Amino acid sequence: LTFSTRSLLNLPAVEWKSGAKYTCTASHSPSQSTVKRVIRNPKESPKGSSETRKSPLEIMESPEDYGTEEDQLENVNEDSNSSLSIMTFVILFIL
């Protein structure tokens, strides 16, 4: 399993050219870890350009942060078993 997030940050060219650093921090509630990336201008903008640059930041998280595939399937099976038990109880109660 692979998870990804894409974020789009619009910056004025003046700020981008200055070499300012921007930090993006992301976390997922079941995960104990936090992903943190620092981005900056990899190369200078065209001279005289006042356009806003768009810089996509892609964060790839490790599937280990969310447990193994077997752990995830086990959680799904537990949820399915609970739903089945509840439905069985309701049907028997109505009869």
Swiss-Prot record:
Any one annotated GO CC term: immunoglobulin complex
Glycosylation sites: N81
Biased composition (Acidic residues): 61-77
GO biological process annotation, one example: adaptive immune response
Domain Ig-like span(s) in chain numbering: 1-36
UniProt keyword terms in alphabetical order: Adaptive immunity, Glycoprotein, Immunity, Immunoglobulin, Immunoglobulin domain
Region called Disordered, residue ranges: 24-79
Name of the molecule in the record: IgNAR transmembrane form NE
Organism: Ginglymostoma cirratum (Nurse shark)
